[in-house]
Amino acid sequence: MTDLNVSLLPWQQKVWNDPIRFQVIAAGRRTGKSRLAAWKLIIEGLGATKGSVFYVAPTQGQARDIMWDMLLELGNPVIASSHVNNLQIKLINGATIALKGADRPETMRGVSLKFLVMDEYADMKPEVWEQILRPALADQKGSAMFIGTPMGRNHFYD
């Protein structure tokens, strides 16, 4: 397989090496949360034998603005195709990385997920995780990364 030059900051490397199933990363703006998430999406996608990996932002527009170009840049050597209209990237192993908006939860029902990133989870309804995405991870015992900027006490804090 093509070599990817995964370059991480020391704090990102600690998170990367942590085997916990559900990671929560609360960090300030411009610290590298999204870049870490992009690398995780690519590597987890390459390791998926079935199912997909999702990146979920509060809206699909935010998902595109935050993650699309970064995934195309970092994953270029292992991307078989990309479709900006539906925000999906097909990797060379056949796995799909899909970018979704939590404001349209119906588009995320009925899938089997290997990995999931929820970005700015504090800006989403908790039901999106509890009723839709958590069950989508169950059959594969998939993992998830919650990232966001601290905003007081809410469901992301909990």
Segments predicted by a language model, with ranges:
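Phosphate/NTP-binding elements of NTP-utilizing enzymes
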Residues: 1-158
